[in-house]
Amino acid sequence: MKYDAVIIGSGPAGSSTARFAAEKGAKVLILERRAEVGAPVLCGEGVGKIIDDFNVLEGKKWIAANMDGARIFAPDGTMIKLAAEMAGDETGYVVHRDLFDKEIARGAVKKGAELMLNTVATGLVKEGNKITGVQAKHFDEDIEIEADIVVGADGVESKVGRWAGINTTLKPYDLETCAQYTLTNIECDVGYCDFYLGKNIAPGGYVWVFPKGKDVANVGIGVLASLSESGMALKLLNKFISEHPELKKGQPIRFLAGADPVGEPTETVKDNLLLVGDAARHVDPITGGGLISSVHGGKLAAETIASAVEQQKFDEETLSTYEERWKNAFGKKLKRNYVVKEILLEMEDKTLNMLADSLKDYKFEELSTLSIVKALVGKHPTLLMKLKPLLKLATT
């Protein structure tokens, strides 16, 4: 059977692409290598309330807790408090990620998409240099699926892009190694997602505490791979928990480990092929969060697919509309935040403490790069030289 689009991966990016494409009349198939959508969970489970604007989730069962905002703790304990609308795409809800993924996939199927579980994509089908479908193994059966467009939504370890000639290799400098417990029997402020910074806490990254209830929270860590060594993330996470008065009595009910891309977005379009979500590196380089950009990018990809199907044109030039649109929608933010990441990596804990001191009492009317720079330099003029690259970005 031939499809307009075969989507490899049933995460938020893949299922959103399928949902919106099917809604516009495209014949769509999702391939999921695992036996269950949304499992295992590999996420801190925070997402901004802007997710509601995309209408991909019904009901509220996927919500574990509502957040009022975020608190950022400098190495010396200085705290910056931000309201949810100012705190970025990872603050608003803490979710049950397995239910979150299932709900988006269910919505895609309701709109007409098909879904195959236990189906591992093993390569691309080509006629000459033209991609015409996907090779896969469904349970123990080798199959070929014909499609005009293949969408790589296969996550941080994406192979689809490489098969099409896109360099998706991540350098250690652009990869976070992560570990997370879901702890119970703890004390936590249910209203806030907490982030802890410091070279001794999480080199090149941060520790997060995302409450899922009054005595349950996801407590995790991301460490930049170029600054890490085997077992470091887990060792530092255990140390943090053992020294935190509200967490040290906690007991784990779930553990997960993985990797998160924190580099710049990659090339996302070839003839007959698109990349979305983590496979496209649509992840905030500072926070490592990517749920909003995955859903948003999936919607833009779907609209491009629908247009291509209508025109019956699937070449790179036609599909490049997708890349142009995501760059305009959130690409500039990702590029800016990559520069911010590089600046933060160069800073000593002393400088991070100065940053927090500058911002702790600042009343943000808007959370813009320029407003942050003004607040920082206004209280600590010596920071100006360190922030010059950021100031240049803010004024261009």
What are these regions (language model features)?
Residues 1-5:
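Extreme N-terminal starter segment of soluble prokaryotic enzymes
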Residues 6, 10, 20-42:
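Glycine-rich FAD pyrophosphate-binding loop
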Residues 107-248:
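Predominantly flavin-linked oxidoreductase catalytic cores and closely associated redox partners
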Residues 123, 227-305:
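FAD/FMN-dependent oxidoreductases across multiple families
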